[in-house]
């Protein structure tokens, strides 16, 4: 389990995003909390997994790989990445590729396959009932990691939860007889106003009318910074 080589220079802002990128290399990272000499501490342990995410090795303490992979150094790294993100030094650039995959796929498997062709991994987190409550995208070309909600509400977990259920509800014979785009043309009008499926259908206009999500996100962050400065000056 060569974690030093795998992590490289990926940028992420939360431990969840960090563990998501490692999971694509069959590595599980878990935080452990406890108390030592009356003081609380947080540590990280790493394990190897198989392709289904099942742990197949004993856990290894972060100290085995060096301080860089311990909780203290990781917290500093995430803080630095978050600061740079807020300053507009990096931002998601994969919106168009994700939208293309959503529009042209006919199943969850096809969606992840199309993303992989663009060197993008999607990690979905599900509860015991199978409901998706989180999604993280890993852009391996730029080595950047984003929770779906950070890319925009159109890429949040709820969208994919409803999208996958919608795909599964279409008869297999119909799915195999049509492209993903044709399925949307045949069925998207049935989506209830304000539903997650309607939101998904709206973003498909990106293919003909691209939206610069990175520019929009930067504008929102700069607006927040200006408001914060005015508050600090008592304006």
For every predicted segment, state its role.
Residues 3-235:
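Extended intrinsically disordered terminal tails
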């Amino acid at each position: 389990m060569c974690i030093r080589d795998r992590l490289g220079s990926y940028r992420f802002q939360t431990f969840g995003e960090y563990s998501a990128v490692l999971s694509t290399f069959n590595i599980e990272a878990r935080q452990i909390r406890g108390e030592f000499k009356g003081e609380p501490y947080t540590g990280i342990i790493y394990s190897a997994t198989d392709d289904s995410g099942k742990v197949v090795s004993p856990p290894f303490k972060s100290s085995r790989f060096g301080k860089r992979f311990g909780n203290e150094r990781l917290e500093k790294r995430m803080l630095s990445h978050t600061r740079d993100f807020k300053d507009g030094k990096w931002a998601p650039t994969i919106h168009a590729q994700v939208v293309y995959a959503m529009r042209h796929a006919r199943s969850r498997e096809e969606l992840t396959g199309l993303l992989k062709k663009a060197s993008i991994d999607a990690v979905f987190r599900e509860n015991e009932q199978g409901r998706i409550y989180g999604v993280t995208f890993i852009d391996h070309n730029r080595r950047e990691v984003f929770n779906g909600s950070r890319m925009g509400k159109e890429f949040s977990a709820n969208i994919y939860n409803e999208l996958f259920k919608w795909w599964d509800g279409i008869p297999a014979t119909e799915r195999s007889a049509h492209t993903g785009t044709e399925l949307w043309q045949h069925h998207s009008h049935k989506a209830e106003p304000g539903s997650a499926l309607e939101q998904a259908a709206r973003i498909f206009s990106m293919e003909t009318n691209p939206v610069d999500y990175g520019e929009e996100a930067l504008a929102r962050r700069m607006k927040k910074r200006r408001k914060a400065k005015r508050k600090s000056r008592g304006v």
